[in-house]
Amino acid sequence: MKSRGASAVPDTPSVMSGHALQQHQRGGGGMRWRECAAVLGAVAVVVLVVTHALLNVGDDLGDLADPVARLRAATDEKAALLSKKTPEEAQAEQDIKAAGGADADGSPWSSEMLQWQRTGYHFQPDGNFMNAPMYYRGLYHFFYQYNPKGVVWNKIAWGHAVSSDLVHWHHLPVAMVPDQWYDINGVLTGSATMLPNGTVILLYTGNSDTFAQVQCLAFPADPQDPLLRTWTKHPANPVIYPPPGIGDRDFRDPMAAWFDKSDSTWRTIIGSKDDHGHAGIALMYKTKDFIKYELIQDPVHRVEGTGMWECIDLYPISGGSNSSEEVIHVMKASVNDEWHDYYALGRFDAEANRWTPLDPETDVGIGMRVDWGKFYASTSFYDPVKQRRVSWGFVGETDSPNTDIAKGWASLQGIPRKVVLDEKTRTNILQWPVEEIDSLRYNAANFSGITIESSAVITLPLRQVAQLDIEASFRLNASAIAALNEADVSYNCSTSGGATERGALGPFGLLIHATNSGSEQLAVYFYIYKGLDGGLRTQFCHDESGSSRAKELLKRVVGSTVPVLHGEALSARVLVDHSIVESFVMGGRMTVTSRVYPMEAIHAAGRVCVFNNATGSAVTVEKLVVHEMASAPIQPYRDA
């Protein structure tokens, strides 16, 4: 491993390995186009090709016969069997097969490519398949869905790992396996609850011998063991069956219980759906002993048209001193129909068993997403040591099931996120990597203060691009913003052509895992436009469409509108860890997660670039600091 001693961050753009920072512009002046330029629009790409030809630059351009068509083509999509995939992905898999998307001789991946895809500082098991953290006696515990016998979701057990800092993890033996009639087809999602006497209990969904979903109870076999290595399933299991009117397979994921003083009972919420109106619902149960439960008659919340809710979370994010009505609660649900996590802010009345959104227009399942990319089944816990709310989500693969089998592993967890209320807007949460992640930083390089002209690309001279923490903020020319007259209400990350769709004030941002020729790159960018009301709107997007030459992948353009207040610079923190890229935008008002599987832009062939594809403004990069990130391998736990 390289030295982790952090070097001083230089005040000016640094020069590494003998390569100076280069800005490549469209047009004359003797400037040459080089790395990453294929992201730019039709006119710019034509000039790129011509300039390379005239100046006889030796870069291998690859297949650039129609680069714009390549970048703007419809996304290649697929679905992995029994994985967390959207319905549109399932249809896309059939389309890919029909079109002969996979190589005729089998997998297009070399062992070197597959090895590169494995992450360095994210939580990932040694092998096989991945899917509520808690804090107990000085350690963070993470129980996760795990298939010891394969890389697909089947016969799920509970893996177990511990950490002292949420970064460096140690594997423990499997906590629970499907060995009873009520969980023989899987020990599904659940939660841990700490009781006042220090006892920990687990509530989990068992997938029974008839595939009915029932709720079950487990407790530590040795409560004095701080590692909680062995668990005993309660003889009264199952402790909760699906109630009348609820489908046997639509009743899962009990959240961590909390004590309610209004009637001195413990409460938990279970996700389900109501076929009347295709509504997602949150069912609340109360108990005094965790063995006998009473269903509270009306759901704590219900939203028509959203379908099955799972992995529900409800927690206070802000509170006043006068009355409970001042407390703002987050309700979050993983919407099974779409495989996306949604949240909303609202008020929770415990006595009435009712959560009410502050804004019905942004209710659960129809408004704000926890993450706009590949991210699902997030759960949170309260960290009593640092007095913070921490959320963690599952990040699946977007390659094929056959590739997962070839790799021997599938999926991982995103970086743990601290969650707070955005006090500036009070309409959204802020999610930010937990501070412990910063301990992995080393060798910072500072490129702040550069200006990117229209249609220009700058290649950053970095030593490696596989594991990075990038802090960036941008500001447009004020006169260009003032000159923006025409309203553009049609721009949307997913439907507007990605990074090649040029406007007066966008797109501009970063290219991750890019090749010299531009044959591969993930574009991470802002796009500003004017609405019909004359107000400016800002979208932040990940354009995955050019991220790999492989045809078997799900490659989309994802993102949405992000709130930007007057005077704020456009900022993003981008965590790069091989095949996962996570963006935290405007201080965490929005997050976007992508999986990328380049075939060429790996090892020394990968690049990171800054680009400006806006037609009407230069972009000032007020801050651009790139930290290399050390690995945090997961080790087996060994007693001292």
Predicted segments, located by residue:
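Conserved Ser/Thr-centered positions that define the repeating blades of beta-propeller domains
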Residues: 163, 220-223, 284-290, 419
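Short, low-complexity, Lys/Arg-enriched N-terminal segments of secretory-pathway carbohydrate enzymes
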Residues: 1-36, 63-72
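Surface loop/turn signatures of beta-propeller and other carbohydrate-active proteins
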Residues: 87-132, 150-152, 167-194, 225-260, ...
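Beta-rich accessory regions
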Residues: 32-38, 51-58, 72-87, 91, ...
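Entry beta-strands of beta-propeller and related beta-repeat scaffolds
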Residues: 139-142, 198-203, 263-268, 323-330, ...
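Structural motif
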Residues: 153-159, 210-220, 277-283, 338-345, ...
